Amino acid sequence: PYPILWVKGQHLMQLPIVAPAPVVTAHADVFRDLFENRCQFQHFQNYLTGLIVLDNKSLANITRCVLESADKTNLSRFFSEAPWFQERVNDRRLVYLLDQTKEIRGPKADALLILDDTLCEHVGSLFDYVDRHYNHGNDTYPLAHNPVTSHYVSGPVRFPMDLRLYRRYEECTQWETFVHQHFPDRSIPKTKKERARFHKEVDPILLADPNFQKLHHQFRTKIDLGIALLEAAIQHKVPFRVLLFDSWYLAEELVSMARYRKKDWISLLKKNRNLETNSFVLKDAVGTPIRLEGPHIAVEELVPLIPPTAYRAVTVGDKTYWTFTLAVRLPGLGKVR
């Protein structure tokens, strides 16, 4: 019988996985020596095949569709118990991809390393480190993992590089458990502002607990993880010149590391970020300098002052963008364009 997938009250027939996909077998031998035996290597190929051919890419569904074994726990045990090392597999993958694409990649000066994070939503809470993470797109808090990822782009070549799992501070440190332990008579606020004030009150006391302090030092911000991904790409000798990231990662620590590593960087700037007014001169439509009051001006206040004649058309593919360029200083970041 073919596996059946239930989707919102409907059942859809899925084709079984009877053998690894040809694209998998064509490249899998590169990884063969990283596995202890043939069974492990076969599970590895079946899992990759499931990720490619199945719409539902969960481990449970891939296991359901693999027909080679009556024991449907084999693939699960491969991930949870088998002594293989995913870091070595990814290292080998990157070496292989860079070697296979060296003739078609673009110049190093035009190559990008893109940093971003995403939400991998889950139905259940049995996964390690699953938590409620904020979704900026729809203002919700789904149950999910929140990996920070790096992606490589060079001409026609593009592939995922690496990831680091972000864990919220309260989940990483088991904060609520320690609060109940040290403050059994206190209730934990639910609103964001009240919770932040409560943190300031109780955290210094919690940090005196060696067990909490140990977990506290294990916490990594998304900026920390982005820097780790940048360092990993450099360690792998990935040829790129430009680091690309959104406004969430526009922080002094990441920018400083990019400069230290001699990488150009491109980011978005939130409209409420301040610019130092003494670092630039803005002129009106007739060329007269516009006087700006105070040491700082927010981006959202500056944009309406830019005359329409100052914009220039830039065409990329079939799209035209109207752009304005200005070199300014941002507090904490220094001079940027």
Where are these regions (language model features)?
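Basic, short loop/linker segments at the boundary and entry of helix-turn-helix/winged-helix-like folds
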Residues: 17-45
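An internal, acidic/charged active-site-proximal segment
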Residues: 184-188, 196-337
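Active-site-proximal, Lys/Arg-enriched surface segment
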Residues: 48, 81-188, 310
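A short catalytic or substrate-binding loop motif that flags glycine-/basic-rich loops and adjacent residues
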Residues: 54-56, 105-106, 127, 138-144, ...
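Charged, often Cys/His-bearing segments associated with DNA-binding zinc-finger transcription factors
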Residues: 2-23
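Phosphate-ester processing/binding pockets and catalytic centers
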Residues: 35, 44, 54, 61-69, ...
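Electropositive nucleic-acid engagement tracts
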Residues: 35-39, 51-125, 132, 232, ...
